[in-house]
UniProtKB/Swiss-Prot annotation:
Protein name: C5a anaphylatoxin chemotactic receptor 1
Cytoplasmic side: 60-64, 128-148, 222-237, 299-345
Residue intervals on the Extracellular side: 1-32, 89-105, 170-195, 261-277
Record's keyword terms, sorted: Cell membrane, Chemotaxis, Cytoplasmic vesicle, Disulfide bond, G-protein coupled receptor, Glycoprotein, Membrane, Phosphoprotein, Receptor, Sulfation, Transducer, Transmembrane, Transmembrane helix
Primary subcellular site in the record, as a coarse category: membrane
Tissues with expression: Expressed strongly in macrophages and spleen. Weak expression detected in lung, liver, brain, heart and kidney.
Membrane-crossing segments per the record: 33-59, 65-88, 106-127, 149-169, 196-221, 238-260, 278-298
Cysteine disulfide partners in this protein: C104-C183
Post-translational modification: Sulfation plays a critical role in the association of C5aR with C5a, but no significant role in the ability of the receptor to transduce a signal and mobilize calcium in response to a small peptide agonist.
MF GO annotations: complement component C5a receptor activity; G protein-coupled receptor activity
Species, as recorded: Cavia porcellus
Record note on quaternary structure: Homodimer. May also form higher-order oligomers. Interacts (when phosphorylated) with ARRB1 and ARRB2; the interaction is associated with internalization of C5aR.
Function: Receptor for the chemotactic and inflammatory peptide anaphylatoxin C5a. The ligand interacts with at least two sites on the receptor: a high-affinity site on the extracellular N-terminus, and a second site in the transmembrane region which activates downstream signaling events. Receptor activation stimulates chemotaxis, granule enzyme release, intracellular calcium release and superoxide anion production.
Glycosylation sites: N12
Amino acid sequence: MMVTVSYDYDYNSTFLPDGFVDNYVERLSFGDLVAVVIMVVVFLVGVPGNALVVWVTACEARRHINAIWFLNLAAADLLSCLALPILLVSTVHLNHWYFGDTACKVLPSLILLNMYTSILLLATISADRLLLVLSPIWCQRFRGGCLAWTACGLAWVLALLLSSPSFLYRRTHNEHFSFKVYCVTDYGRDISKERAVALVRLLVGFIVPLITLTACYTFLLLRTWSRKATRSAKTVKVVVAVVSSFFVFWLPYQVTGILLAWHSPNSATYRNTKALDAVCVAFAYINCCINPIIYVVAGHGFQGRLLKSLPSVLRNVLTEESLDKRHQSFARSTVDTMPQKSESV
């Protein structure tokens, strides 16, 4: 799926068929078939699921800071899901690209934009939760919708910059033997470019966030449980589930990216990794549809989900109540909620 042009004397990867010989019949590999099935499911679940989350959170964004965070997460996931039909057409037709050079640069790159946007937004949410615990008075005075939207805007801009190599190095490639057009990532003849991109992607998009967010939520969970702040604990648990799913579904993609960048196309490791790459990319796409499922499961028990509409369940999870009347003391309730005069958490 993620095609990279290959030169005879460097280590850039290629997803062109393994040679064109007489009587060779092209067909989808088992890995491609699995990838197609996964992507179809992701599209069918992710588009309506994320569209519903966008609708619910957009209605609540003026009153609840949490709604702003989850609105941007859902928008990033929805954007990636909407590109899937075109990518599916290319995959089913053995990576033949029908849609021109501009679409080649933009559409396959959306998954990387999603990766960086998601992890940066999750880091922003984590910082927000941490500030609510460590500096509740500061949050009471300065935490508001304008600051939240500014933080989300910065996350999107930084994600665009981090994913820009994919936009810059993607192009269409005409295969002379098969007379097909492929959408490829061409790093040229300098292997260091591909390795640098893969390394930055691994460090910025995975390892550093994994370490920092693990430490952050270990502290937050211990703090909320010790104070029995049930409402805040529920929000933290939802975010922990979203963060965990991100790392689970992106891990295979990161591993294959490093292996393909550091091994010769002639090596057995490279060939075996390449055979799994389409599945790993599709597996990463699952992260684009899993969040709405997490929100619904976290909303209520099974009976509650039967009795209440999906928008009500999502609204309950993605926004937080204002001040609990049973905890009027600000010192005892800053983890749970903020006072009535401030925006809801």
